Regions:
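Mid-domain alpha/beta scaffold segments of enzyme catalytic cores
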Residues: 1-175
């Protein structure tokens, strides 16, 4: 499958396992030409499956790796957008780009990220009845920075909600 590309990284849920050995494995994987990005990386303060200090450290180290490798990052952020933005500004945004994965908040949260030139992906949550703020945010993202995604098997869009999300459901989100 020559057109398939992958992203590799240590998700914030697993940040407690990030160590020099894991980083060495990532460095090795980043040399594979099929790797297109480093991700999902970031901060998830909703579940706190890993201690926040571990999440911050893994996030910073992986940002540095992405910049060294000249690769974009795919960010998983939950209840931590302001802190993640501060870290990104301290560490520097990768020249290759930054993608906010599955954004589902409001324009006030998103605007500084867009000002930094980030790409923004919206998943099925964009179609939920209570997502007016997210739809407004999506409408304000420049077209050249706007993406849709499924986050399958999660966040199934209307009208398929309640079922397992599948890749072809991205059409409902895009509409």
């Amino acid at each position: 499958m020559p057109r398939v590309r992958i992203a590799v990284g240590c998700h914030p849920h697993n940040a407690k396992f990030y160590d020099d050995g894991l980083e060495a494995d990532l460095r090795r994987m980043l040399k594979d030409p099929r790797v297109a990005a480093l991700g999902e990386i970031g901060l998830d303060y909703h579940y706190d499956f890993s201690p926040r200090d571990d999440q911050r450290e893994a996030f910073r180290r992986q940002l540095r790796l992405a910049k060294e490798a000249g690769l974009p990052v795919v960010l998983h952020l939950r209840e931590a957008h302001d802190e993640a933005l501060a870290i990104m500004r301290e560490e520097g945004f990768p020249e290759a780009g930054t993608l906010l994965h599955c954004f589902n908040l409001d324009w006030a949260t998103l605007e500084p990220w867009v000002e930094e030139g980030c790409y923004v992906a919206f998943g099925g949550a964009l179609t939920f009845k209570n997502a007016d703020d997210t739809r407004e945010a999506a409408a304000r993202v420049p077209a050249d920075r706007l993406l849709t995604e499924t986050d399958a098997p999660y966040m199934t869009p209307e009208p398929m909600r309640g079922m397992t999300c599948l890749p072809d459901h991205v059409l409902f989100t895009a509409e």
